[in-house]
């Protein structure tokens, strides 16, 4: 669940908004935005700061979601679980085995982001022209169970510990 939960919506646009949470202090808190089972959603030119559990999570058969020109950051208020973006919330195939087509374009992960930029189970994920400026991040991109990633023309600043960690997934990377 999220501070803002978008459930079962179709043809929905979120644009030019700032979402600021109290800080990432535990895994049991809310996401700033939780997209649940919605289709044809566009999130554009938004900023996400200090989500409790995550900044923007996309789950439960959401489909055809585009996140563009957004920024994600965790400040000093976030001392645990600074994991920004999750796609599919569990290993259960009903989460989105044939859904979860998600594009991340021209986004910027800034300081404090440690992991899940994004992490996905299932789905087809396209990442292009994104900027990872998050020194100290444990790992940026996490393809997981049965997900397919197309990763194109992304830039990773110095100081990122691991750019990529893959588990039971397919990823194609173009530089």
Name these PLM-found stretches.
Residues 2-103:
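Right-handed parallel beta-helix
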Residues 10, 39, 52, 114, ...:
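A generic "binding-loop/recognition-motif" signal
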Residues 18, 47, 71, 106-110, ...:
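A structural signal for beta-strand register positions
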Residues 30-32, 107, 117, 162:
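Generic hydrophobic/packing signal
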Residues 42, 55-57, 116-119, 139-142:
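Short catalytic-loop micro-motif centered on adjacent basic/acidic residues
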Residues 81-136:
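Aromatic-anchored, glycine/proline-accented short structural segments
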Residues 119-175:
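Extracellular beta-rich repeat passengers
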């Amino acid at each position: 669940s999220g501070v803002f939960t978008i459930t079962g919506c179709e043809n929905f646009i979120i644009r030019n908004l700032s979402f600021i949470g109290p800080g990432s202090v535990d895994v049991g808190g809310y996401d700033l935005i939780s997209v649940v089972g919605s289709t044809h959603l566009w999130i554009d030119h938004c900023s996400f700061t200090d989500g409790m559990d995550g900044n923007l999570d996309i789950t439960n058969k959401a489909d055809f979601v585009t996140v563009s020109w957004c920024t994600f950051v965790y400040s000093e208020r976030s001392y645990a679980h600074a994991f920004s973006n999750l796609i599919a919330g569990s290993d259960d195939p009903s989460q989105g085995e044939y859904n979860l087509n998600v594009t991340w374009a021209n986004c910027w992960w800034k300081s404090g982001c440690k992991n899940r930029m994004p992490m996905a189970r299932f789905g087809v994920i396209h990442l292009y022209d994104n900027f990872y400026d998050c020194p100290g991040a444990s790992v940026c991109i996490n393809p997981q169970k049965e997900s397919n990633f197309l990763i194109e023309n992304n830039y990773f600043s110095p100081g990122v510990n691991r750019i990529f960690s893959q588990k039971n997934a397919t990823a194609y990377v173009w530089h």
